[in-house]
Amino acid sequence: MFVPACGGTRPMPTLEEYSFGTAEFVEELRENFFEGKKEEGVGAMESATAAPLRELGERWRGACGNRCSSAVRIIDLQKKSSSDLTVRVEFRLQGWAREDSPERVAANVFFDLSLFRRRTPESFPDGRWQLRSALAVNGPAVIQRGVPHLFEEAASRGLVAPHEPLDPVESTNLCLPATHHHPGVLLVDVDGDGFIDVIVPNRHPRLFLNDGTGHFRDATAGSGLDLLPEMEASGGVAADVDGDGLADLFLSNHISPCRLLKNLGNGKFRDVTQEWGLAGLSGPFTSAVFFDADRDGRVDLFVASYGDARVTGPVYDGRNGGGDRFFRNVERNGHPFFVDETAASGLGDVGWGLAAGACDADDDGDDDLYVANDFGKNGFFENRSTFGHPFFVNIARTNGTEDEGYGMGVAWGDYDGDGRWDLHVSDYWTPYRWILNDSRWPMPPLPGVGLVRPYMGKMMRRRSGGDALFRNLGGLKFARTSEAAGVADGGWAWGAEFVDLDGKGREDLLVVNGMFRATTGVDDEISFWNAMGREGVNFHDGVWGGIDFGVNGMASRTPKRLFWNRGDGTFEERAFVEGFDTLEDTRGLAYADLDGDGAPEVVLSCFRGPLHLYRNAWGEGGGRVVVRLSADHGLNRDALGAVVRLRVNGRVQLREVRAGSSYLSQSSHDLLFGLGGAKAADVIEVRWPDGRRDTLHDVPAGTLVTLVEGRKEKRDFLRR
């Protein structure tokens, strides 16, 4: 796609032009070494300089016997001269070991390729690139092998709810997220039968009730959701707000008023938006969080707000969003009533908010709040509330979590097993960061723009550096470990969660990604980046409104990420070999034990695509414990903010009951633990929201523990 250049009509640079023609050359390398094609004139294919590529190609063809595929992309380029440069490339290989085998094989391999060209009549008269050397960046390539443990079964289990997008042409819509940023998904026990149900925010929200085996029926008709007017509901959050033991529902909207619905039981809801104090809550709202901000026993509400791209763009720093909102639950006339205390609480940030997650990050008994903002800096809001007086202070700049970028998802977990909460922020990683170093990268036609070009390029490279993993050092200090841990490249990332998929007692990390698919099959992310230099001049017309969503795609059909926890502070990406292989443009991600075996299933929502449900086959064997909590007084019956520590074989695992995380989504309130092969958990310690504690000993593997605060626990067997 061509878009107008700043100040003129000249076509902007293409990938081939930015790469000085090397993009075509590395494609030829891929075809020769990994597809078995022999191209004329590529040069040096049989020489010693190509030996590392040739050796990998031979190994790959020996490992992959069926449906083998390969892809390559340039992720960095260093130019020495017009005829001498180095490119760093990633080869992504995947396929099946044999036609008659479920075993999959995959490899992601990085090479630094030194390239040159000469324009002499005697040697390479066409001036084509030649390979001087190929150096594997991380040593010899490892070819992964594995039989999948995740199986996509949404349709066969009755979970069918096509996404209902708005008009695909952004220029006709009111704000950017209403068209391309949703939907999310909520996993919550709606009808109180102990089985996790599914709510899908949508133009017409949907409810799917679980029959207890992980199969679902569409129960939308007659639920009260069917009485709601058409909306842009993209996300939501569910928790027991009124203390009756049933999960109430909040739906966030971008244009229409947000909705709050009381759970009447038996899968029925009633709209209480006005009655409970939230009438007229309209704006470009995204993710929401229920939590008890001031420890008064009532569930409060935080809603992140985006911005309206038609009015003004984020102006590089993204400090002109709609303004996040905080509502304190004061209880009135015997039912919840929400009062806007945004200003007094300190939670009225004006970034372009997309995601939020509450967590007691400093283990002081109250939940802090992290907010991920698009186009700028994120916020870490330390909770300094007193009883009845919510108050937060943004300490992101001083505690190491500001993470300037394009924040799109929030996940809390303890990935290194040290008993402290770590933080993952989904962000934007692009393989095209290197074009921002190029003098041809377009800038707006402003006086003195040449002076700020180095600053602009540096800022944009910093913002597009990928996901942020922050290790908790204690004392509310964090260190970014994304690159060292191997999780920076999440693609154009959205939903994310820490979850122990394989039951080994370590939290893995799931990240979903993708923007939108083209009707032509053309991915035109380069044009997006060509336009981003004008972000602060006119974002809607100059950047987003200049993209024809009906024709050209962007960062679409990208592999999702399953970062398997090695147990040494690093992760191995294993999505394809484990079966987490959808190429849909995914948004929301949530997990829950849907079939009662203790293992987490994963549900994804997709932009212009179907729901996905991944059944977990690692659950077979019973080596898990599930903890289900209920407070015995006050309105916070779901025990939001309760923290559970499970100790087994000298190691500690950490979980917290939350409502709202990932991106526009919510995972189950049940807390899932893997015992790593142990026969029992040695100790389970529960710290309730009011500070009281309970301790359980010798809890066998394969147990569902239901614990009401202050009472003896009930133990049931998980399904095997």
Task: Please report, for each region that a protein language model flagged, where it lies by residue.
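Beta-propeller domains
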Residues: 201-211
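Beta-propeller blade termini
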Residues: 182-190, 209, 233-243, 262, ...
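Hydrophobic beta-strand segments that make up the repeating blades of beta-propeller
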Residues: 195-202, 249-253, 301-305, 368-373, ...
